[in-house]
Regions:
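Ordered, amphipathic secondary-structure segments that act as subunit-interaction surfaces
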Residues: 78-91, 98
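Helix-start/capping segments and mature chain N-termini
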Residues: 1-75, 97, 101-174
Length: 174
């Protein structure tokens, strides 16, 4: 599988993100997922606008890569060669050698993009054909659900609660 990391398209096992990246130490990053059906990006402009909105609301500088995002996704699409795939785009505030809530002013955002085949998901039957089993739960996360942050512990806890039935997805609501 091929991924994009900070200006390079490379094989996934060659991609290395620093353990000092603020996405690891603080969950300090945002993400967006853009699906592609029959090799066509779905609602690209709307997803890009939401990604930029999350970046602006978290004061993470908008990386120049976003100007070429469509071309980057097309190249990944070709290299990974899935007809239907989803692109996960994660942008963190970047690497900081000294752990501190205050980010250094010269921190450069880390841009990471990967994709996966929408036809096969080892965690559930094909949702494109069979549908999903879901559960509704109160949203107990922080109050800024308008920002797609990489800190998804609330979602993870909902999926792993052993006292509840197994589902494909949990829909959180306020």
């Amino acid at each position: 599988m091929w991924v994009y990391l900070n200006g390079e398209i490379l094989e996934a096992d060659k991609a290395k993100i620093s353990p000092l990246d603020r996405s690891s130490t603080f969950g300090d990053g945002v993400y967006e997922v853009i699906p592609s059906y029959n090799k066509k990006l779905f609602l690209f402009d709307e997803h890009l606008a939401r990604l930029k909105s999350s970046l602006n609301k978290t004061f993470i500088p908008i990386p120049s890569e976003l100007n070429d995002l469509k071309d980057i996704l097309k190249e990944l699409h070709t290299k990974n060669n899935f007809i239907n795939q989803s692109f996960y785009i994660q942008i963190s505030r970047g690497v900081q050698n000294i752990r501190n809530h205050q980010a250094a002013i010269d921190t450069i955002p880390t841009v990471f993009i990967t994709s996966q085949d929408l036809e096969t998901n080892p965690f559930r039957e094909n949702p494109c054909r069979k549908g999903l089993k879901v559960r509704l739960e109160d949203d107990i996360r922080w109050q800024r659900c308008d920002i797609k942050t990489t800190a998804l512990m609330g979602n993870i806890l909902s999926m792993h609660n052993p006292s509840l039935d197994k589902v494909d997805e949990v829909i959180l609501f306020k």
